[in-house]
Amino acid sequence: MLVILSGVAGAGKDTIKKEIIKRMENIKSIPSLTTRPQREGDIPGKTYIFLSKEEFEEKIRNDEIYEYDIHHNHYYGTSKKILNEKSKEYTIIKDIDVNGTEKLKETLKDIKIVTIYLRVPKEELRRRLENRIDKPSEGEIILRLNRFDYEESRIGLYDYVLKNENLEKTVGIIEEIIRQESKN
């Protein structure tokens, strides 16, 4: 099973994903492929697989990627090989944007997909972005806030839409969703 967490940058996807992995057995994350520069705290091969633009584009040409998109001038995508291998052993939890979610729902026929969209009020989103450790510039904050309306307009793609106001509560709800969906 593949559990997709979506929401705009700052919605809490990564924090929730890490907490779910800590609390639940047999659930893992897989790294995304990206061309963005490595940041402090990134673990190559675990959080991301860092590629040059040329390497990423070669993987696209060779049909090695299920979905990809460009955010803030960098490619992000999901490796077919990694997802196929890991999903045989584990439930995979992955944070993916709305475009990637749509593509995976169209493409993956042999893996059960559960999609969860995390909502956060726009004002709260700005506050979270401004308080991040890797605080984005004002220009990046504006770009991410502009993306908010687009992402919110696509919530019909999702099986579940949760308002993420309280981490503990949201994680508990997602744990229950995963348990219930695993039974089906």
Predicted regions and their residues:
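Hydrophobic anchor at the beta1->P-loop junction of P-loop NTPases
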Residues: L5
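P-loop (Walker A) phosphate-binding loop of NTP-binding proteins
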Residues: V8
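Walker A/P-loop
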Residues: K13-D14
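Post-Walker A helix-loop "phosphate-sensing" segment adjacent to the P-loop in P-loop NTPases
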Residues: K22-I30
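ATP-dependent small-molecule kinase phosphotransfer cores
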Residues: K28, T34-I92, V98-G100
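A glycine- and Lys/Arg-enriched "phosphate-lid" helix/loop adjacent to the NTP-binding pocket
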Residues: R36-E40, S87, I96-V98, E102-G156, ...
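Phosphate-binding beta-loop-alpha motif at adenosine-nucleotide cofactor sites
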Residues: G156-T170
